[in-house]
Amino acid sequence: MEARYRRDYPGEFVITESKWSGGKKQIKQAWINNPIDNQHISGRAVVIGSDDDSEIFDHKILSTHRGGLLGSLKLQTYGTAKIAQQMRLDFAVDTDINNLTPLVENQYSANNIVYTTARNCIRQPGEFYLIPLQPSICTEVLPIYLAAFDGHNEIYTLGYNKEMPTGTSDWIRQVTRIVESYSTTTFTFVGNKHNMPADWLALPNTRTMNHRDFVCHCDV
């Protein structure tokens, strides 16, 4: 994976129709502009991958995080559709239309930014935003990718550990690839250090932090 950033991303072509005619495959494409200009003061984000640690730390309080004086410590929030059903995120992302449907029905997607695949954008016009560059990674890893893509200098993760259920055994390697690619970004994995994959902790731009230290460090 190559480190790419929103500031250099004008948009991309997506396939809107594909069919066979006369023995040849014909496709129609449409250009999708980058509609997001993400201005962040602190350069800090928190990514909530699951609610595994909710008994230790209630992640929902992050929806009202102010970030101290002039918002200098404010965290932009990223997470999946499951987390978006629990709290308002700055940026939600999911690839499963079944997870996204509740966000349409309760008007969440009408008032907040929700990313998904080109297919889902076409199925529900006007409801979602296209995942930039559409990397081949699992849903739970996408919030980390988006936070890095948006150019944050510090990314804190909640709910990411060895036991996180994702439905794929490759997800730990996918996180490792993102951390390696965005080598100038510091990734802080919040939780029990002994429950974090060794591959992550071996990288020079990672660190761990328990929940108490996270609360103090980020003025939550």
Residue ranges of each PLM-predicted region?
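Metal-ion/cofactor- or nucleotide/acyl-coenzyme-handling active-site neighborhoods
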Residues: M1-V220
